[in-house]
Regions:
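Protein kinase catalytic-loop region centered on the HRD/HxD motif
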Residues: 143-154
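Conserved C-terminal C-lobe helix
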Residues: 255-270
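AlphaC helix of the eukaryotic protein kinase fold
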Residues: 55-88
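Conserved short submotifs of the Hanks-type protein kinase catalytic core
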Residues: 104-118, 122
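Activation-segment/catalytic-loop signature of the eukaryotic protein kinase fold
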Residues: 100
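Activation segment signature within eukaryotic-like protein kinase domains
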Residues: 138-139
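Conserved activation segment of eukaryotic-like protein kinases, specifically the C-terminal portion
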Residues: 190-206
């Protein structure tokens, strides 16, 4: 059993699991209910697929192989750091974290529940790109979120349509800070391991693991690639294929304005 069953309670009954919202390689996300405040929440659980297993009777998570215990503990600490980073961010376009705790041999954090879907899910469902007006609205909102993130000296490092949620009112939210890194006081970055990235959304410094070249521009590149994908419903070009100030690597629909084309090309400068 990889996920908690409906009606499972956490923190002495404070939270109740309602259903699974999503599953990934490092965790499960649930729709939950805060019984104290009588409100729906999202609950993220650290669970390493292929490394951990769950007792069906007690719901306790354990490591399948003793050789993976250290890896599990290190990744669980990163999971908790992700929650703490999110907790510090105060912007209406970033999901708020309200609680962090350990239980069942693993860790959980509780967030606002967004009644919506990711931009990637929405495009997959409709089979159509977003209109330029819709993209401009989304871009404006995510830039607000990134301003807060970067002022806190955090780089998101995994910005893409799958990591932006949109609700039924058109409000956009930047989510999933699992790959994010924070700059220490001495200017170094909080990582000693190789970083994963999504092809098409990563600039050259990220592909080449050149940590000393990371900065706000790394996220701006990914946001430009996201805008391109939303406008075209096509995979963005790889950074290595983009020439400076040239549109040759891009395939915009004729409906996209010249100003928007220039903006995307500028954001995705190699």
């Amino acid at each position: 059993m990889q996920h908690l069953q409906p009606n499972t309670t956490l923190q002495g009954g404070k939270y109740k699991i309602e259903r699974v919202l999503g599953q990934g390689g490092f965790g499960n996300t649930y729709v939950g209910y805060n019984t104290e405040f009588e409100e729906t929440v999202a609950i993220k659980e650290f669970f390493m697929k292929g490394v951990t297993e769950r007792n069906e009777t007690t719901s306790v998570v354990s490591v399948s192989n003793a050789d993976n215990v250290q890896q599990f503990e290190e990744q669980r600490e990163k999971f908790k750091k992700e929650a703490r980073r999110l907790r510090k961010l105060k912007n209406e376009h970033i999901v708020k974290v309200h609680d962090l705790f350990e239980e069942n041999g693993t860790a959980y954090y509780v967030m606002d529940f967004i009644d919506g879907e990711s931009l990637a899910e929405k495009m997959k469902k409709t089979g159509q790109p977003f209109t330029e007006a819709e993209v401009r609205s989304i871009l404006s909102q995510i830039l607000e979120a990134l301003k807060e993130v970067h002022q806190t000296e955090i780089w998101h490092l995994d910005l893409k349509p799958g990591n932006i949620m949109i609700d039924k009112r058109g409000n956009a939210y930047l989510i999933d800070f699992g790959a994010s890194k924070q700059i220490r006081a001495n200017g170094s970055m909080t990582t000693s391991t190789a970083l994963c990235y999504t092809p098409g959304y990563a600039p050259n410094e990220q592909i080449g693991q050149m940590y000393d070249r990371f900065g706000p521009w790394t996220d701006i590149y990914a946001l430009g690639a996201t805008v391109y994908n939303l406008l075209t419903n096509k995979k963005p070009p790889m950074a290595i294929d983009i020439e400076e100030d040239e549109e040759d690597a891009f395939d915009f629909p004729t409906t996209v304005s010249n100003d928007m084309r220039k903006l995307v090309v500028w954001m995705m400068q190699p």
